[in-house]
C-alpha cells in the first residue's frame, strides 16, 4: 500500500534528478494522504522554488512552520524564498532562527552570505561564505 512516506521519497528522488514538476506531483500525493507531512511540505516548497514560484513556495514554508516552528530546514528554505523575493532583512532574521536551531547548517550559512552580498555588505558576505569552507 502506498503511503505518504512513499510519495515523499519519490518526490525526493525526482527533486534530486531535477525533475521538479514530477517531484511536485509526488509531494502533492504525499500531502493528500497526510496533510501534516512536514517533509513533503518542505519538498513541495523547494520544488516550487526551483520552478521559480517563490511566493507560492514561501506560503508552503510558512504553513510548514505552523505545524513545526522548530523545523530548521523549513526556516532555511523560507530564508531562501525571501532572498529570491528580495526581502533581505526578513531573510536574515529567518536564517538566524534556523542557525539557532542548527548552528552548523552549512546551507543556512551559505544563504546568509548570499543575502549579505545582495545587500552590498561584502565584508559579512565573505565572512559567512568563507565560514562555509571551514
Model-flagged regions — what are they?
Residues 3-33, 49-50:
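Alpha-helical segment of the N-proximal tetratricopeptide repeat
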Residues 4-5, 38-39, 72-73, 106-107:
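Helix-start (N-cap) detector for alpha-helical repeat units in TPR-like alpha-solenoids
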Residues 16, 50-51, 84, 118:
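Register position in tetratricopeptide repeats
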Amino acid at each position: 500500500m502506498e503511503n505518504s512516506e512513499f510519495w515523499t521519497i519519490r518526490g525526493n528522488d525526482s527533486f534530486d534528478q531535477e525533475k521538479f514538476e514530477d517531484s511536485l506531483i509526488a509531494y502533492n500525493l504525499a500531502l493528500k494522504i497526510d496533510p501534516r507531512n512536514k517533509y513533503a511540505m518542505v519538498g513541495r516548497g523547494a520544488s516550487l522554488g526551483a520552478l521559480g514560484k517563490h511566493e507560492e513556495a514561501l506560503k508552503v514554508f510558512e504553513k510548514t512552520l505552523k505545524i513545526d516552528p522548530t523545523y530548521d530546514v523549513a526556516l532555511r528554505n523560507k530564508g531562501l524564498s525571501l532572498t529570491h523575493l528580495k526581502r533581505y532583512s526578513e531573510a536574515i532574521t529567518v536564517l538566524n532562527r534556523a542557525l539557532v536551531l542548527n548552528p552548523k547548517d552549512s546551507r543556512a550559512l551559505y544563504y546568509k552570505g548570499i543575502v549579505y552580498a545582495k545587500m552590498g555588505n561584502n565584508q559579512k558576505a565573505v565572512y559567512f561564505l568563507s565560514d562555509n569552507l571551514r
